[in-house]
Amino acid sequence: MVENSSSNNSTRPIPAIPMDLPDYEALPTHAPLYHQLIAGAFAGIMEHSVMFPIDALKTRIQSANAKSLSAKNMLSQISHISTSEGTLALWKGVQSVILGAGPAHAVYFGTYEFCKKNLIDSSDTQTHHPFKTAISGACATTASDALMNPFDTIKQRIQLNTSASVWQTTKQIYQSEGLAAFYYSYPTTLVMNIPFAAFNFVIYESSTKFLNPSNEYNPLIHCLCGSISGSTCAAITTPLDCIKTVLQIRGSQTVSLEIMRKADTFSKAASAIYQVYGWKGFWRGWKPRIVANMPATAISWTAYECAKHFLMTY
């Protein structure tokens, strides 16, 4: 007589899901600090350098002298700039972000891991902590932006069609505007980047826990989740990015409008944008910003997770 296999299967105990799965969202507690710094620096350089031409186009769109550019002619604009100004025109200033992005992102991810380690129990890898994750992200961007802001200011000045080098631009800004010019946009940068970073980490970790509950190293999932967080955060923070751009380029010789040149505070920059462009002015460059941030954030997270995985394995 053949036994009913379904009845036998129903009595078999269901194997328990192991709760001590490796957590690739954080380095182990015994990992030295330099592992986090190296992984963060690698991620930052990859993120900012690969998508630099799109970021340069966004800066031109947001600048006071930019003509109205639409997303449908974004590729034609890139082609036109490359043809009329040279192949490397949209790469002007990349040295500045490489110099700044490495140390700044080392601080960024290092601070994030440090805060998360002290706020969240290391043995609790299964529970999601969005509020503590957001706090960690906010602390991370506050620390890293203090280091990155001068380099970002230099980058945007060079992006506005100038042939000056990083050193020449730095010297020119300091001599004509003083040290404060490198930090005019820092408060606005924090207003923009604190929610950006908080949402970035929360959306990324929420989506990875949903798509990768086993916490396994999976570059495809890291890339997908990074794209989701990057595009979402870029879209909602575009108005603040427009204000930041005005503050960073106000002293450039390419800015001819007096109202833009005198905008040295958040409120003045916002008022100048509204007076010149209206409400639509706060969304100038939103499409190239998303196009740049979606792959850039995906690259950043994928590179960071890859570097962590490599350092943990080897």
Swiss-Prot record:
GO terms for molecular function: ferrous iron transmembrane transporter activity; iron ion transmembrane transporter activity. It is a multi-pass membrane protein. GO terms for cellular component: mitochondrial inner membrane; mitochondrial membrane; mitochondrion. PANTHER family: MITOFERRIN-1, MITOFERRIN-1-RELATED. Belongs to the mitochondrial carrier (TC 2.A.29) family. MRS3 suppresses a mitochondrial splice defect in the first intron of the COB gene. It may act as a carrier, exerting its suppressor activity via modulation of solute concentrations in the mitochondrion (possibly of cations). This is Mitochondrial RNA-splicing protein MRS3.
